[in-house]
């Protein structure tokens, strides 16, 4: 059967030899030792003598090449990888072709192949497979490359061990050499895939889509159009796969819209204090955030958008022209920027676009407002941000490394933030306090203190906005607010550790619960260090709400209202939202800030160092007297502490019950079912138990059920007061 297959195959090969008489130039050898791809014509034009060894049986059954793949002009111009061949003999010829000896490759037969010198495998590096005799090389190619190949339209995609994957620069710009083992090269899209099963599925997906070599090359040569998205009356061009950071240089996440709106309201509120403001978007990507600042705030801000990637800088400049904003490069207006605007169009402002490392830029220039939004953690840029930030300026930090902050990768949190955390019911506020603590330590190293304006932790990011207070006194006061937290793993009660350097004999006494006395073993752990002071500034949040109403940002108003309720720790029914009545004079923790239009940056700086020190001193005194008015730290999840067999009251009613009991209470944006209150966990559970109803009535009348439930509630409340461990509610975390 093999001889018959060989006889049927030889006429076909002779026809191919007669047709493909094309002279192929000798390719230059790669300096790295990696063989260059061999043209189709060079391999197909070699004659196959009758004495040559018969190919594998699978080759005789290989189907003919499809017309779309054989007659495509794009394939004639392009070169496929050397691991993609028609026959096993073509792989053997590559040992001579890669050495540049095309004459010997064209006249290759079994005699001179066996009598040849030692040859190396064309698909393996020299350190993996050394040069050997022809019979060993033939056996190596057949067993380790040809038998595990993937067939597609008459071609065999053999396994390759060469370092074919291109290296990519990292964030700093250094080349990263990634180790790569055996892999396949797709004949259609030239992708590199490591496993054979994955390669089969990859080719199958191409076939299901009807893609061939010619159609894929034609589609890839056409430049994909850029999509234009609109957000807050700002148009931005985005690249294909803009929402996948691994597949694009300019990442744009539509889910971060709330983050961008919060930062815009922050800058708008700061612009009422003094103008113009020097603003920096350190990681521009598409430039959407800086474009919103310049387009809506106008001459009140001087925006600088920075990015290290050259493609992102080009995209930012295109988006500036798309929004009728002139681009400034190196303090000079970009050439040909006037030609972009048509007659009658108005220039809405200027934006400076820079291409440098964010740390270098923040060391070179001083700013009033800095926003950091790197891909991942932001701890590598905090020292540079506080180095040249102006007094009473604002630094906003967006952290997207939620796997470490939300206690999914605790070792990463210990490495980046130097703190110990576990997964708790209040893990989102714990993440916000971790970031604030890192920001406070970075500011203290630069002899600066901070005042937290607000902190937001949602599903995709953690946003922290702080005001900078210059001076060692403010730095010392800020450093004192970084403390450790004692957390009970049974009932999840928590309390910040007392100040002092003396070692306490029994730290369990600080916890309000008695789980250590009623439960075996060690019940509490130490978390932190964390920020222990307030996370919100009510006055600044009200000004942000006013700016959101002024600019018509309806999507963010609900969140800002929730932050205001949370900062004052009051139910929503006891608070009314209204615009500030006197915008010329507002107080924030003892600091009176003028917000008239006449205030400029020069007048603000000219007030002198002594005057600013007096303002900071008054701020410290006011903060000491207002410690009791701060919102209570952390919150309780009402579902986490529910009683089995009991129906909980509605959340709004439960807030009223806690308020009637004399406790401060409010909802929290960290958890939709969370309750922020200064009530201890034992009182929280007793009130929750008091107003819960049994789930099963048993067919009794309503009056009997009500009296029985009241007796049951009374007994359970007495039991909860006497036994603080409360076996029904205590669960191991």
From Swiss-Prot:
Its main location: nucleus. Its EC number is 2.1.1.-. The modification Phosphoserine is found at residues 66, 612, 707. A zinc finger (C2H2-type) spans 184-206. A motif (Nucleolar localization signal) lies at residues 135-139. One of its GO terms (cellular component) is nucleolus. GO terms for biological process: tRNA N2-guanine methylation. Pfam families: TRM. Coiled coil: none annotated. Residues 1-78 are annotated as: Disordered. Residues 39-49, 57-73 have a biased composition (Low complexity). InterPro entries: SAM-dependent_MTases_sf, Trm1, tRNA_met_Trm1_C, Znf_C2H2_type. Residues 1-18 have a biased composition (Acidic residues). There is a cross-link at residue 585 (Glycyl lysine isopeptide (Lys-Gly) (interchain with G-Cter in SUMO2)). S-adenosyl-L-methionine binds at residues 260, 307, 357-358. The modification Phosphothreonine is found at residue 26. This is tRNA (guanine(27)-N(2))-dimethyltransferase. It comes from Pongo abelii (Sumatran orangutan). The gene is TRMT1L.
């Amino acid at each position: 059967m093999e001889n018959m297959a060989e006889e049927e195959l030889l006429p076909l090969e002779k026809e191919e030899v007669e047709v493909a008489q094309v002279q192929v130039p000798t390719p230059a050898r790669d300096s790295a030792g990696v063989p260059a791809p061999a043209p189709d014509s060079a391999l197909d034009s070699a004659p196959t003598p009758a004495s040559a060894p018969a190919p594998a049986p699978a080759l005789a059954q290989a189907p003919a090449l499809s017309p779309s793949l054989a007659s495509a002009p794009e394939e004639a111009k392009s070169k496929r990888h050397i691991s993609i061949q028609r026959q096993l003999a073509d792989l053997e010829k590559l040992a001579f072709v890669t050495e540049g000896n095309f004459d010997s490759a064209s006249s290759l037969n079994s005699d001179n192949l066996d009598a040849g010198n030692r040859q190396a495998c064309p698909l393996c590096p020299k350190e993996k497979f050394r040069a050997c005799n022809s019979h060993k090389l033939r056996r190596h190619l057949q067993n380790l490359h040809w038998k595990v190949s993937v067939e597609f339209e008459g071609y065999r995609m053999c396994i390759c061990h060469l370092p074919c994957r291109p290296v990519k620069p990292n964030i700093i710009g250094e080349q990263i050499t990634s180790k790569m083992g055996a892999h396949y090269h797709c004949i259609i899209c030239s992708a590199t895939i490591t496993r054979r099963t994955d390669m089969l599925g990859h080719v199958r997906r191409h076939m299901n889509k009807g893609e061939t070599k010619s159609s894929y090359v034609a589609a890839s040569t056409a430049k994909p159009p850029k999509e234009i998205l609109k957000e807050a009356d700002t148009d931005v061009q985005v690249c294909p796969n803009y929402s996948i950071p691994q597949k694009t240089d300019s990442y744009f996440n539509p889910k971060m819209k709330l983050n961008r709106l919060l930062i815009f309201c922050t800058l708008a509120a700061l612009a009422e204090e003094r103008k113009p403001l020097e603003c920096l978007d350190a990681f521009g990507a598409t430039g959407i955030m800086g474009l919103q600042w310049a387009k809506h705030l106008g001459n009140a801000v001087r925006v600088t958008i920075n990015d290290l990637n050259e493609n992102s800088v080009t995209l930012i400049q295109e988006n500036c022209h798309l929004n009728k904003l002139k681009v400034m490069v190196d303090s000079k207006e970009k050439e040909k920027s006037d030609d972009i605007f048509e007659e009658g169009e108005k220039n809405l402002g200027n934006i400076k676009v820079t291409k440098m490392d964010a740390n270098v830029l923040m060391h070179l220039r001083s700013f009033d407002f800095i926003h950091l939004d790197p891909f991942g953690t932001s701890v590598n840029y905090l020292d540079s941000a506080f180095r040249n930030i102006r007094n009473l300026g604002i630094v906003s930090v967006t952290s997207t490394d939620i796997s470490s902050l939300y206690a999914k990768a605790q070792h990463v949190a210990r490495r980046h933030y130097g703190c110990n955390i576990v997964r708790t019911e209040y893990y989102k506020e714990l993440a916000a306090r971790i970031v604030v603590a890192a920001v406070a330590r970075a500011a203290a190293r630069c002899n600066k203190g901070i005042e937290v304006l607000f902190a937001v932790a949602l599903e995709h990011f953690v946003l922290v906005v702080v005001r900078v207070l210059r001076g060692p006194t403010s730095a010392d006061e800020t450093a004192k607010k970084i403390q450790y937290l004692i957390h009970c793993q049974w009932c999840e009660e928590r309390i910040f550790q007392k100040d002092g350097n003396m070692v306490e004999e029994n730290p369990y006494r600080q916890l309000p619960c008695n789980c250590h006395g009623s439960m075996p073993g060690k019940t509490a752990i130490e978390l932190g260090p964390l920020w222990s002071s307030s996370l919100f500034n009510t006055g600044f949040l009200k000004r942000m709400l006013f700016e959101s109403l002024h600019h018509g940002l309806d999507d963010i108003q609900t969140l800002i209202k929730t932050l205001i309720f949370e900062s004052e720790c009051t139910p929503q029914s006891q608070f009314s939202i209204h615009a500030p009545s006197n915008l010329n004079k507002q107080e924030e923790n003892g600091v009176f800030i003028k917000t008239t239009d006449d205030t400029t940056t020069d007048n603000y700086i000219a007030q002198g160092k002594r005057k600013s020190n007096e303002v900071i001193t008054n701020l410290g005194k006011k903060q000491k007297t207002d410690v009791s008015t701060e919102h209570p730290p952390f919150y309780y999840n009402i579902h986490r502490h529910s009683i089995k067999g009991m129906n909980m009251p509605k959340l709004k009613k439960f807030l009223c019950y806690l308020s009637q009991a004399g406790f401060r209470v409010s909802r929290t944006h960290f958890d939709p079912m969370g309750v922020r209150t200064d009530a201890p966990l034992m009182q929280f559970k007793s009130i929750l138990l008091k107003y819960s109803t049994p789930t099963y009535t048993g067919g009794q009348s309503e009056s009997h059920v009500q009296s029985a439930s009241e007796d049951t509630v009374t007994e359970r409340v007495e039991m909860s007061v006497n036994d603080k461990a409360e076996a029904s509610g205590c669960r191991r975390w």
